[in-house]
Amino acid sequence: MLTVSAIAEKLGLKVVVKGDLSQIVSGCYISDLLSDVMAHSKDHELWITLQTHPNIVAVAVIKGISALLLTNGRNPEPATIKKAEAEKVTIMMSAHTTFELAGLLYSMIKDSQPPQAGPS
């Protein structure tokens, strides 16, 4: 299984707020609309977004998101950092684009899962 810590290390991500870095990451959800994340994300997913305001932390807590990943070198707002520290939500950031990170994470997550049995 893939952890937040392993992803941060392998991709050279800057960890801005250290929540539980041992959390499992089972998938990835990419969206900048909070309502979309609320409706469609799943427990233990990594959320990739451009959003930097404190509401992303609230959504991450409600949805059981393993960590937040901010792209394009975006820094979280000071209030977001404070809220994430209080809620123990990991926030990471990268200078990479959302597209680049999506591709890298897809490969990492796919490679970490056991092979599925095909037809006999």
Predicted regions and their residues:
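Intrinsically disordered, low-complexity boundary segments flanking structured domains
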Residues: 1-2, 15
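Short, structural beta-strand-to-alpha-helix junction motif
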Residues: 2-4, 97
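Short secondary-structure junctions
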Residues: 12-18
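Feature captures the catalytic cores and cofactor-binding loops of soluble hydro-lyases/lyases
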Residues: 22, 31-46, 50-120
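Structured beta-strand/loop patches that form or line metal/cofactor-binding pockets in enzymes
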Residues: 26-28
